[in-house]
Amino acid sequence: MRNYRHIEVKPIAGALGAEIAGVDMARDLDDEVVAEVRHALLDHLVIFLRNQKATPQQQLAFARRFGQPIEYPQLKGLPEAPMITPVVKLEHERHNFGGIWNSDTTYLVEPPMGSMLLAREVPPYGGDTMFANQYLAYEALSDGLRKTLDGLVGISSSAKADVTRTREDALKQAGAGATPKTLQAEHPIVRTHPETGRKALYTSDAHTACIKGWTEAESLPLLRFLWQHQVRPEFTCRFRWATGSLAFWDNRCAMHNPINDYHGFRRVMHRITLAGDKPR
């Protein structure tokens, strides 16, 4: 286990996830603190900060210490901070944003390396987010299946993401009823993390349409097995939100799933995604 001098790191599960103490997003952080937070992210795949009181501009400044914020495709950001996407579910809505296991926007040629979600308003119960370790998911496969997967390419599509899972008000604001442009990209089913060198599964029911060179009928049996395998309980952690909580996860090796179990209540989150590279 890595020794930290400037922050406190407390794992929340055996598979992944750790709460970080000693970090205030509203302040200008020392380089040493930023370096340790980055190490904690690489070690634990998703990290959590509590009791943050940062403004949108302070949240953006914090995010820029770890990468380049980018706009979320097809949805508008805050007027005063376009790189921050409001993730909102209102009392009358039934669907939540991204309500399925996924790694963010893999239908982009260069998907984001990480995402930050800051809780502004949370329901009295429910609305947790689950995360799954894709290093462990890959390493738990048999040698034979790992050899089969190495070299396979998945085709990701924004059409597969199913826009009906996102809140209708946000979509109306984004395009005034216009049909969103379908985005598509090809990525390896097994990617190598550019910083750790470890291999991770990189496919999801949310975005992967089929395997390149295979028909959909041929692809689905293998993909469905992987989608179930990727989120086995022993690969996961679950985070309970409170106002001022921040989650920062590594999309290159972790999946997430926002639980939609708080109907009748309002939930408001501010999300930032950080630019990534082309998976290899």
What would you call each of these model-derived segments?
Residues M1-L246, N251-R280:
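Non-heme Fe(II) oxygenase catalytic core, chiefly the N-lobe of the double-stranded beta-helix
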